[in-house]
Amino acid sequence: MKLCIIYHSETGNTRHVAQHIASPFNANLIEVCDTASYFQLTRFLVRCKMARSEEKTTIAPASLDVSGYDLIVFGSPVWAFKSTPVIHAAIDELKGCMGKPAVAFSTHGGRPGQTDETFKNWIEDRGMVPVAVTNIHQNDIENEKKIKELVALVHASIKV
């Protein structure tokens, strides 16, 4: 079974979790980055507003072909109780995703808000099948038990 983990990470928390999930499966890791330029003083506010409104931004890589994968995993930090505009754009630009099973996780420092529901909707809108959606608090990203639970969730999704 071939896995692909597509994630966006600003502080490294989501990257850290994605790497831990990828390791036992030898999954391909694809980090998606925001290519839009923002005024430094308002960068945080503008991007949180975009997340809240479920907007998308310009990204690199601009599109991803996932036709060669059996399971797609998405990872995003939580901004203003939603997934980021970066991961939204990545999901929207996927090629070869129709009918594929997908797992999504988010990392957060407070509360996940509507992130799980938003992820599920975006995945379904692109014709994929959401088999698991979860989140992990930043205090738990070094917690071996929590990481093992995420890995087990992905492993269970392979059997779906």
Protein language model features and the residues they cover:
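Accessory recognition modules or surfaces
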Residues: 90-92, 109-112, 142-151
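Short, glycine-/small-residue-rich phosphate/pyrophosphate-handling segment
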Residues: 103-137
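Alpha-helix N-cap/loop-to-helix initiation residues
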Residues: 10-14, 80, 111-112, 140-143
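A glycine-biased structural micro-motif
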Residues: 98-99
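N-terminal beta1-alpha1-beta2 submodule of the flavodoxin-like/Rossmannoid cofactor-binding fold
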Residues: 1-75, 81-93, 128, 135, ...
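Ligand-binding grooves and catalytic loops that recognize ribose/phosphate and carbohydrate rings
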Residues: 55, 121, 145-146
